[in-house]
Each structure stands twice: as structure tokens, then as C-alpha cells.
Amino acid sequence: MEKTLAVNAGSSSLKWQLYEMPEETVIAKGIFERIGLSGSISTTKFNNEEHFRKQEIVDHRQAVLLLMDELIHFKLIHEFREITGIGHRVVAGGEFFKTSTVISPEVLAEIKNLSTLAPLHNPANVLGIEAFQRLLPDALAVAVFDTAFHSTLPEKAYRYPIPTKYYEDYSIRKYGAHGTSHMYVAQEAEKVLGKPLEDLKLITAHIGNGASITAIEAGKSVDTSMGFTPLAGVMMGTRAGEMDASVIPYMLESDPSLRNAQDVIDILNKDSGVLGVSELSSDMRDLSEAVAKGNPKAILAYEMYVDRLKKFIAQYFGVLNGADALIFTAGVGENDTAVRTDVVNGLSWFGMEIDESKNVRGAFGIISKPESKVKVLVVPTNEELVIARDVEAAK
């Protein structure tokens, strides 16, 4: 039986799902966390069982070796060659990659070159690709790009209002991210709403530690909040999101500990957002606990977070000239009842009314009242399934 592995490699993590294809049956899934850090742990789930293993994991290559060892140990596979395809999530494809692509040496080199567009992500994606290539050299490897879904953006949306030469000579433009997730939840919403995707105007809110909002018309991305890199857009767990670019040179001039622009970018990427304002955590669960205890910095961080989500969602009502539905997905979007309530109530003048009993349950489907002019949905994302499907399509 042929099996396909969907892989999402982060800077210190490796998330995976093993599928039986083309049936799309999930055999097992898991994650390696804190790779290269203290307290490394792996989680493997199958047959309603959950297995944990704590041990030092120094790099992605070791994580891949441990993963294959666990698949054999738990008899999820009997030999490596049962895995005939591996799909890798790659965040930035630039203008070069507009569809999922079989990984060749040339493709891998270009993914490395595009790391400037996703400095937190593409290097980690490359580590995952190279680690699996060493262990499973005969498996078909496919790169699935976060930016591909946004290749339909009109020029008025993806161009920045800067001199044209910077676009033509240096490809400086909006690329977006989380495209695989936005595409998947839009397709799932079509089933719930009972209308063809071609007839729908949707606003999708992928809200996790990283977050982005996308305007979708007739199944195509027409605008999105992330930009040249995933730093742009709404306030995120550790990323600042949208802000005045003049802050960068001012921070350099003001803080003698900062050596160059990259130091500032690192702060905006890794030490800002919810973490930077709350000075507590990048995790919304931690923030919610602190808000409940009256922590003023946590309260401010939460208010800023919700406010920026509302601003981008409101913008996209204008871009689409109205919308049929607002869709929440990803870690915060799927699980944080308060964020959904405060965002929707803050946009009630668009005709959205949340049903609190449905919102508290947070189950897949509509969580707005029947009379709500704009439907509000919770749709769990499944980027791994999209990745597995794209591998199958490439065979």
C-alpha cells in the first residue's frame, strides 16, 4: 500500500501526517517540538492513542531519523520504501513558483535563494527537505508553496506604491502566506454554505501564532494581509505586523545595541507582537489567563490584537464590496472563543451576529445567528491534507 508523508518543518519543529493515498486515510500524525533546544519532545498519534518521547533532538536530520524509527517501531510502516511521496510545506515561492512543484536540485536552490522573503521559514523548510532526501532518496518530493494561492492577486493589490524599478528589478511586491490554509477553508466553507465557490465572497482569518487575513472572490485570492514577507499585516504572536517603515532607521539611531537593519527586523519578527507588548508570552492562552487576572500589559496586548484583526477584516469588506461569510481557522481562530466574539461584535455593523452557544462549542460550521446577513464560520484547517493531495497529483 502506497503511503504519502506531509511535512511542515518549522525553525524548531517538524509537524507531519502519514496518509494512505489516494484514499486520504490518515494513518498517523505527530510533531517534534523544541528541535535544537532544551526539553525536546515528540508526539505520535494513531488509533486514538498518543505517544510521547522526551529526548534531546539536536537538528532536523535527527528528528527525521527518529520519525522513521517511530513509524517502524509502531508498525505504521514495515520498510522505508512504502513511503512513495513526501510533500513539504514551503512558505515563500516568490514569483518563481505559482503551483506545487516536484523538488529537483534546481528547485531546492531557488527555494534557498527565496529565504530572504521568509527568513524564519524557508531555511527550516530546506532543512526538512534535505533531511528526508538523505533518508528517502527514491520518494517523490514535492514542494507546496504558501504563496501559490496568492498568485491570483491583481496588480493593484500586490504592487507597493514605490518606484517601479524596485518591482521590476528586485521583485519587491506583496506575496502573502498561509495560502494553502486559506484555499482549504474556502473550499470547505463552500460545502457548509451550499453555494458554489465561484459565487461566494469570503474573508478567511488564519489566526495562529502567525496570522493573516485574505479576501477571496470566486475561489481566488484577491488581497491578503501578509506582504513581501510574513512580517506584514495583523499583530501576531511575536511579529509586529503593519507599522511605519520609518521606525526601523529610528530604532537603529536610538538604540546603540542595534548594529544594523537586520537586528531591527529580528526584533520585529521574534520579540514583538503579543509577546513584545505583554512582556509575558506569545501564546494567546497565556495572555487570556493574564487578562483574567487584570494584568494591564496583557489587557493592552489583547485589545491591540483584536483591534488590528478588525481593521484588516473591515478593509476586505471594502475590497470585496461586501462578503458572504467570515471564516475563522488555525490555532487561535479555531479555539479562542473570546477573540471570535470580540472581533465579530466589533464588526456587527457589517450585519454579523454571533450565536454565543454555537461559538462556545466552536465546532466546524456556522457560529452566527440565522438572521446574520454575513455568516460566521469556524473551519479547522488541514494544510497537510492539501499537501498530500498535491503529491498524489504529481505522481
UniProtKB/Swiss-Prot annotation:
One of its GO terms (biological process) is acetate metabolic process. Substrate binds at residue 89. Its cofactor is Mg(2+); Mn(2+). It holds the Pfam family Acetate_kinase. Mg(2+). Can also accept Mn(2+). Pathway: Metabolic intermediate biosynthesis; acetyl-CoA biosynthesis; acetyl-CoA from acetate: step 1/2. It catalyses: acetate + ATP = acetyl phosphate + ADP. One of its GO terms (cellular component) is cytoplasm. The active site is at 146 (proton donor/acceptor). ATP binds at residues 15, 206-210, 283-285, 331-335. Keywords: ATP-binding, Cytoplasm, Kinase, Magnesium, Metal-binding, Nucleotide-binding, Transferase. It is found in: Cytoplasm. GO terms for molecular function: acetate kinase activity; ATP binding; magnesium ion binding. The keyword Protein transport does not apply. InterPro entries: Ac/propionate_kinase, Aliphatic_acid_kin_short-chain, Aliphatic_acid_kinase_CS, ATPase_NBD. It is an enzyme of class 2 (transferase). PANTHER family: ACETATE KINASE (PTHR21060), ACETATE KINASE-RELATED (PTHR21060:SF15). HAMAP family: Acetate_kinase. Catalyzes the formation of acetyl phosphate from acetate and ATP. Can also catalyze the reverse reaction. This is Acetate kinase 2. It comes from Lactococcus lactis subsp. lactis (strain IL1403).
